[in-house]
Amino acid sequence: MTPKLLILLFFLGSFFLQAQNLVWKTNMNDAIKMCDDERKPLLIFFTASGTSQKIQSEIFATPDFMDWSSENIILLKLDLSDPSISSEEKEQNVKLKEALGIDELPQVCLATASIRRNKPTINKLGMLEYKMGGAKKWISEAKIILRGE
C-alpha cells in the first residue's frame, strides 16, 4: 500500500474508533442517577428501527459532539423498538416519550434530571431535531437550550 493510503486509513480508523467511544445509557433510571450524581443535564435520544440515521452519522459520530457531550451532558438513548428490553421498561420509555411531547422519531430532548426523596424528576428544557449544518451548529443550538435562552 502506498503511504498516503495508509495515512488515510489510519485517520479514518481513528475517527470511527473515537465515534464509538460515546457512552449512551439505555436505562432511564441509571441515566437519572448519573445526572443527579454528576449534576449534568440529560440528552435523551428517542429512536426506533427504520427511522433516519442522519443525526447519528452527521452529529453524534463527530469528534466535536464527542468532546462536547463528554464534558457537558449525560447521554440516554431510548430505542422504542428494541426487542431486548423488558415490557416494563418499554412502557416506562413510552410514558416518558408522551410526557415530554415527543411525536416523531428520531427526536432529541434536553432535560434536567434529579432524584429527590427517592423519586426521579425530569424537567424538559427543549427539543432538537436533525438540521443540516453540522455538529457545531447543532451543539450551539443545544447550548442555547441548556442556558435557558
Description of each model-found segment:
Residues 54-57, 88, 120-123:
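Short, solvent-exposed loop/turn and secondary-structure capping segments
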Residues 24-41:
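A short beta-strand-turn-helix
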Residues 38-52, 108:
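Short active-site neighborhood of thiol/selenol oxidoreductases, capturing the structured segment around
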Residues 99, 103-149:
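Non-catalytic, surface beta->alpha helical segment in thiol-disulfide oxidoreductase systems
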Residues 1-21:
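Bacterial Sec-dependent N-terminal signal peptides
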Residues 32, 53-70:
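Typically the conserved alpha-helix immediately C-terminal to a functionally engaged Cys/Sec
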Residues 21-26, 47, 65-91:
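Thiol-based oxidoreductase modules, predominantly thioredoxin-like and allied folds used
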Residues 36-37, 67-70, 100-104:
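Extracellular/periplasmic catalytic domains that process cell-envelope and extracellular macromolecules
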